Design a protein with these regions (language model features):
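Intrinsically disordered, low-complexity N-terminal segments that are enriched in acidic
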Residues: 1-87, 249-258
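Short, solvent-exposed aromatic-acidic interface loops
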Residues: 33-34, 45-49, 156, 206-212
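Acidic low-complexity segments
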Residues: 72-153
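Hydrophobic/aromatic-rich core segments of domains that either
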Residues: 160-239
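Short hairpin/turn module used for nucleic-acid contact or packing/dimerization
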Residues: 227-259
């Protein structure tokens, strides 16, 4: 109807770093692939005296800012305006359904196999297998888990052990880095895990094993790499800020069709 409105999100990523005076500068940062749930209405790369290019690789998008010379404190901006994609079309999703096991031996192998037995017993399919694996690895009182984590209980280390256990069962897993769409609240990328079940990607909370990505999460990039890399500079930092506004749904639908 005429009165219906939809959310429009403005996202700013502010990139700050210190350039070294001698070397050319190359800054690479992941930006959202925007291939499923959201559509971009406007995207800008703001800088002074930098060349800009955007590339796609392995399902991700990456912006590269480059300059022959720069010195001192540098600030670059990435700005994105997006909205939910409303489409009845079912896009065909592809993903891996098999993988090779990661190499493991010694006490780690025994610990991993000891964890695998109950995981297999309590699982019926990919979804329950991944969920059960995540729950087991988050049980920090388990001696087998303690041995595999080796004193490092960070989210990335836990994800690494979850990945190892899933590989023994030939179940593929990817790390997913998301941003939460909440107005006027500073955000940092949040780690999720996903696995392909033959039809679709299933998303899992790496702390609880709960399945399903909340609707306010925007997928920013997947894989093991960091959000940003800087050649010819140091102390790189990315700050996210966002706000939302409403727009007439009919007008927004027209804009969405144009993009």
């Amino acid at each position: 109807t005429e009165d219906e409105t939809d959310d429009l999100w403005n996202i700013d990523a502010k990139v700050e770093f210190v350039a070294s005076t001698k070397d050319p500068v190359k800054v690479q940062m992941f930006v959202p692939p925007l291939n499923r749930d959201y559509v971009s209405l406007n995207e800008s790369f703001i800088s002074n005296n930098y060349g800009v290019s955007v590339n796609r690789a392995d399902g991700n998008r990456k912006v590269t800012w480059s300059a022959r010379r720069a010195s001192g404190n540098q600030t670059l901006y990435y700005r994105l305006v997006l909205t939910k994609r409303y489409s009845n079309e079912k896009t065909t999703v592809k993903g891996p359904t098999f993988r090779d096991s990661l190499a493991i031996e010694g006490p780690e192998k025994i610990a991993a196999e000891a964890l695998m037995a109950p995981i297999r017993q309590h699982s019926a399919d990919v979804e329950t297998f991944v969920s059960e694996t995540i729950k087991r690895v988050n049980n920090l009182n388990d001696d087998n888990v303690k041995l595999l984590l080796a004193g490092d209980t960070s989210p990335m280390k836990k994800a690494q052990i979850i990945d190892l256990l899933l590989s023994i069962a030939h179940v593929p897993m990817e790390k997913v880095h998301t941003i939460r769409l909440v107005a006027d609240t500073p955000q940092t990328p949040e780690l999720w895990l996903r696995s392909f079940n033959g039809n679709d990607w299933l998303y899992f909370n790496p702390d609880t094993g709960e399945q399903g990505l909340p609707s306010d999460r925007l997928l920013w990039w997947t894989g093991d790499d960091n959000l940003i890399t800087v050649d010819g500079g140091k102390k790189a930092n990315v700050t996210f800020s966002m706000n939302n506004s409403e727009m007439n749904a009919i007008r927004l639908a027209k804009l969405t069709d144009e993009n």
